[in-house]
Every structure is written in C-alpha cells, then in structure tokens.
Amino acid sequence: MPPIALARSACLVALAGAVLVQADPVAAQAPAPAPFRVEDATIAGVREALASGRITCRGLVQGYLDRIAAYDQAGPKLAAIRALNPQALAQAEAYDADRAGGAAKPLGCVPLLLKDNYDTAELPTTGGSAALAGAQPAQDATAAARLRAAGAIVLAKANMQELALGGVSVSSLGGQVRNPYDLTRTPGGSSGGVGAGMAAGFALGGLGSDTVNSIRSPASANNLVGLRVTQGLISLAGIMPVSKTQDAIGPITRTVADAAALLQAMAGTDPADPLTAAAAGKVAPSYAAALKPDALKGARLGVVRVLFGTKPEHAEVNRVMQTALDALEAAGATLVRIDDPAFEADALNREDDVQTYEYKALMNGYLASIPNAPHKDLAGILASGQFHRAALESFLKAAEARRDGMAEPEYKARLGRIAAFKAHVAEVFAAQKLDALVYPLQKRLVVPIGELNQADRNGIVAGLTGYPAIDVPAGSSEASATAPAGVPVGMDLLGQPWSEAKLLGLAYAFEQATNLRRLPASTPPLEAR
C-alpha cells in the first residue's frame, strides 16, 4: 500500500494512555466527571460539554487525532484517512480562545471527515488517485465553506473508492479501506473512508457523495446514518463530479440528530450551482424540529419487495430487515406491500444509468478548474496509468471513448427513461398515499476485501429520481469469527422531493425505538485496550 500523505507532525502527539478529552482547569477542581468518550460523542453532547467547561475544543480534536493514530495505520489499520489537516489543532485553540464567539455558531468545534472529493483550500483534493496527488483547489467547496462558517473544523480528508467510481473503497493513494466491524470485508463505498472513520470514532461528523449508492452503502455497512438529499438541496459546487444527472451529497453520522444538524448548515441556494435554484423556499427552518420519537405513528411506508433478494446469500439481510419491519409496525407505521418490477435495481443500473455518458465532460471541466492539477483531462489520467487499474480502467476507457457522450442518441433515450421512471415513482407515492418507501440498501452483506464489485445494491432508485433517501442501522448479521458482533445492515427510507424533514423524523423515531448503534470491537475506547 502506498504511504498515506498524513501531515502528522503538525497534528499528532504521542499516544499516552486513555484518550480522554482535556478538562477545563476550573472544572478540574470539581469532583472528576465520568470520562468524555469522543468515539460515541454527539454534536449536542459536545456543545453541552464545551459550555460547561468539561472539555476544551483542543482536547476534543486531540482525542480524535489519538484514535486515528491508534487505529488507522496501526492496530486494525483501517486506512480510512487520506490526509490530516495540519491546521486543525490551531483552529481548535482559536475556538477555545474565543469560546463565547464559537459557542454562538451551531457547529462550533465540530470536527469533520470530508470525503476526498470535496474541495478544500488548505488540503489537496485527489479523489484518492495517484494521478491527482497534490491537486490543490483554490477554494473550499460550497458545502465545506458553509460547514466552516457554522463553526465546524475540517479534521481530515477521507480515503474513498478512487474517483468515486465503485463501491469497495480502494484507491491508488490510500489503499483498501477496511470495515471496522469485520476487517476481512469492505466498508461499502464509494464514501468508505468516511464510513469506516465515523464508525471507529475518528470524528464527530462526516460528509460523503452519492451518485448511486455511495453515502448510504457505507452507512449501511458501518452501522451509521447516511442521508442523500434531494438533488439541488445542497450545492455541488467544488465537488469532484461523476454525473450531473445522478450526483448528490450529504452527511454520514452516528445519529439522526447529527445528520440533521449538518444538513441545516449546508442546505440552500448557491449561484455557483444552478440546480440549487429549485431549493428556494424548500429548506426547512429547523430540521431538528422534525425529530420526534412518535413520528412513525400513522406513517404509511411502502415495502418494495423487488428490492429484497431471494437467494441464499440474501438470507441474513432479509432476516435483519424483517426484524426492522416489525419494529416499524410496532412504532405505529402501516406497511404497504409494493410489488412492482419497475423498481428492479439491476435493470435500472443496466438500462438507465448515465455515468459513462456524462463523466468525461464533467471531469475535464473540473480538472480545468484546479490550478495545479497534474492532468488537465481524463485522457491525461488514463495515459498516466496512475490509478487503480483493476478497479477503474474499464470505466475510464469507456468514458474516454465517448467523443461526446451527452449528444449520443442512447444518452437521450436514457434520460427519457429516467423521466418516465421518476413519474412512475411519484404515481406510486400518490396512489398508495405513502410517506416513504422502505428497502434494504444492500440485498447482501458487503463483499470481502479483494472483490471489486459491491454486488446487489439498491441505491439506484434515489440516484435516478433525485429523491432523498436516508439509511439507518437496521441490525447486524449473526456473529462470526471475523465479525464478533455481526456485519451491519442498513435500511433505506426514500421520500418525495424536499421531504428531508419527514425522512429525518421517521428515521429518528426508528433509531430511538431500536437503539442499534454499537462501537466496533476492533476500535474500542483507547483506555480499554
């Protein structure tokens, strides 16, 4: 595995015993409180601890850096982190120096992992590709800038499936990301570094991108919450692109409430992304206000049966999902069976996906915007050979071979089929009076390391329609020698456009009723090692 470009010298101190967040000197005179566990911390919990003086922002950031030092390139060697931000500790100290000003911001001192396809002004954005090593954007992506304006600290850029083209999270710069719940398996993808890092307690929040599955797949595989928003709700300006038809971004977090908090900071119109014009008047005043434990009472949820597998390898996911469906009913939801072959994911991927038609023009445009990009077009990346050939070469060659993919008759035919499918999904919602559709994000458990195709995923429904979808922990497979607590399984809830508040409410009610989040055995509290 190539060495990771980690700016450790500016960020890390020697690991010494337990990672307990630095206490305020005044608070230290009081009886010692229980240790503050950064690995399970929430945004609300951190705000309270900072306000009370129980922790400092510097101590919080150091706590996460210590866990990264212990578990990313040591211990289980998760390989979730591509680069640390050398300014993170200084930014934390600035918060502590102006605690009143920082506390006034909704995300004051919230350390974040950003997938390495988010432009950042102080860190290269490489997409995990050796061909783009050192590529330095001139400014932050809009989403990153808004998070910082809300007080967040970019702690690190996360490893990912190279160029976001696949689902096993392997890259030429960062190597293979491991799933902390089963170190022999992949973490889903393409946002797998964010997924593994958030599961392992490397930060307080994470951000991913999703063309087909790529936020919700790592959420599903790592016992997390992943929200793909309505296309246009969050700006894509400064995000390394794959498909203008299918791309969206969103948070990956340990709780639904944290996802709502990050969404609130990012959502809204942006002149740099014309798609966001549709979001005018659509941003909820408070997504947190929708988080009610009884939100499932009276909800009508369509269970899309064609998105469940029927083969032996699907049995574990089906078992977990049945338990989750029972929990939805117990919480007051009405389940409506949807038997509709139009939702068949493999057919939608095969016949309607437009990534190879759009990728070349979009990537060439993005590379032209990076002042020092080592290659200025897709042809240059291909010619360099500096990418994970087994994972990417077939796609890159297919995309480059299209002289003008978006002018091809088949591309236009696919757009027509996408429009028809989107209209059909809207009709299903209306005819059945549904609040959301329900299905497993993956029909089977995430594949073992070494396989290059993350088979049997269902994310294409949201990818083609642009509808929002949230993935929440549904349970885990049976325990095994390599997965002491089982492999996590996620449940997708897909809603109509701009229904993020409703989806967050449904997901929150399920989360509160089930309480399924557990820290992986491979990354325990440091003092417990």
PLM feature spans:
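Bacterial N-terminal signal peptides that target proteins for export
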Residues: M1-C11
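Short, well-ordered alpha-helical
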Residues: Q29-T126, A130-A133, A164-L165, L275-A279, ...
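Sec-exported extracytoplasmic/periplasmic mature domains
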Residues: E48-I55, L65-K77, P86-L89, E93-A100, ...
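Structural helix-boundary/capping segments
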Residues: A70, A200-G302, T310-K311, Q322-E329, ...
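Short helix-loop capping/hinge segments that flank enzyme active sites or metal/cofactor-binding pockets
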Residues: G108-G127, A290, A295-R305, T356-A426, ...
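Short glycine/serine-rich loop/turn segments
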Residues: G108-I249, P274-A278, G302-V306, L437-A455, ...
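Gly/Ser-rich, acidic/histidine-flanked active-site/gating loops
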Residues: Y118, P124, Q246-A248, L275-K360, ...
